[in-house]
Amino acid sequence: MGPQRRLSPAGAALLWGFLLQLTAAQEAILHASGNGTTKDYCMLYNPYWTALPSTLENATSISLMNLTSTPLCNLSDIPPVGIKSKAVVVPWGSCHFLEKARIAQKGGAEAMLVVNNSVLFPPSGNRSEFPDVKILIAFISYKDFRDMNQTLGDNITVKMYSPSWPNFDYTMVVIFVIAVFTVALGGYWSGLVELENLKAVTTEDREMRKKKEEYLTFSPLTVVIFVVICCVMMVLLYFFYKWLVYVMIAIFCIASAMSLYNCLAALIHKIPYGQCTIACRGKNMEVRLIFLSGLCIAVAVVWAVFRNEDRWAWILQDILGIAFCLNLIKTLKLPNFKSCVILLGLLLLYDVFFVFITPFITKNGESIMVELAAGPFGNNEKLPVVIRVPKLIYFSVMSVCLMPVSILGFGDIIVPGLLIAYCRRFDVQTGSSYIYYVSSTVAYAIGMILTFVVLVLMKKGQPALLYLVPCTLITASVVAWRRKEMKKFWKGNSYQMMDHLDCATNEENPVISGEQIVQQ
């Protein structure tokens, strides 16, 4: 039997680090008037359910009625004065908000605002179960509603509208740079590690490195098992989200802190200053690395505590996420192109299945990935599996809303990044300069551009692997075919092509086999 493989915290986090699409929620403005003054508030609504005008001038003025003291789950909850032509404010809970909307509509209400006690989350649910619901449904925070009552009094009228967004947002450029930079640097770093392995002076060093890396190498069988576990984890998250989301947050904190340490420690080791050490249990530890570990833990803890602070917590999440992706691309190894094809192919099917097929299976007709992205059961916690960048272009009036963001799943970086890392290692093994590495990196960039183009045209979140996998696999295959190295590239072997490096090493450290003497 082969060595038993253990799954590290980083590997466990990778199981759920694949694309989660945006839901159909959209920010809108609630323009409230009362006591001779006006104020704007943020609300979330589903544009596929109800359309809103794009300007304040075209919005209709509606009188607001506070029904937060009643659950509005039965017709008897409607007050005697009625709610006809009103925008009613109801509390979250007791029954489904779509049931509340149906009752409000029967009472003649024109709109329903659901007050949530925590941060806003997108309205989601199976609209097909309530096809008769036509009124506007929107969500506002309890904090905003309380401020509205204190500032504007009891006699409030509201206008609701949703300013149109430009088709292109420069946030796409930022995400593009982050993604390409991460896969390129991770692949290059993996190549440097491979070069160090091949230049190991002694056979013992090589064997020690080889055994160490066996735990981090994905064989074809391991790849299949990995994808199966991914599917199981996705289903478990779907049914037990409200508990498992905190497990995933904890895993991300541990894995990202370790990854950030590994990335920064690699840089610090290149600095020839401040190398003082202290002895602890017979081992010498550099003081600067001790401080570094404390810093990395502190960054992860601060993010965990303030993860819902949308104004700035995204910066920490992106830093931790980039480090997490870099470390996995450098550490995890696909031994050959065959494993790359199996992994990327299966994860492409995984992505398509959970985005496009699961709506035909789930009871509410929603994609499992979309449900997890929104937070099932109205859960305000989100899985930290994405790079988040606030939109750089948005109207000043939208500043009252939670900062709108564009996202890219970790899986859209890590999965193609593992292929690019293999290409770089193959370059090192064969001495083929950077041809495979550069070609696959350029192909990844083209795939990202294609993803953004489709995103703009379709105006809907896209499973990026649908475009990244074909671009990278086809490009790598064409390069290997043109260089007549397909067989070698397909089978791969981290230790099969070391003759030229052995010769170079032996010239510096000549060792004569047999009965001859090692030169001193």
UniProtKB/Swiss-Prot annotation:
GO molecular function terms attached to this record: aspartic endopeptidase activity, intramembrane cleaving; protein homodimerization activity
Membrane topology summary: Multi-pass membrane protein
Localisation: Late endosome membrane; Lysosome membrane; Membrane
The entry's keywords: Endosome, Glycoprotein, Hydrolase, Lysosome, Membrane, Protease, Signal, Transmembrane, Transmembrane helix
Disease affiliated with this protein: Immunodeficiency 86: An autosomal recessive disorder characterized by susceptibility to mycobacterial disease after exposure to BCG vaccine. Affected individuals usually develop localized mycobacterial lymphadenopathy.
Main location, first listed in the record: membrane
Protein name: Signal peptide peptidase-like 2A
Signal peptide: 1-25
Post-translational modification: Glycosylated.
All ranges on the Cytoplasmic side of the membrane: 194-220, 269-285, 333-340, 421-437, 482-520
Residues annotated as the enzyme's active site: 351, 412
TM region positions: 173-193, 221-241, 248-268, 286-306, 312-332, 341-361, 400-420, 438-458, 461-481
Motif window: YXXo lysosomal targeting motif: 495-498
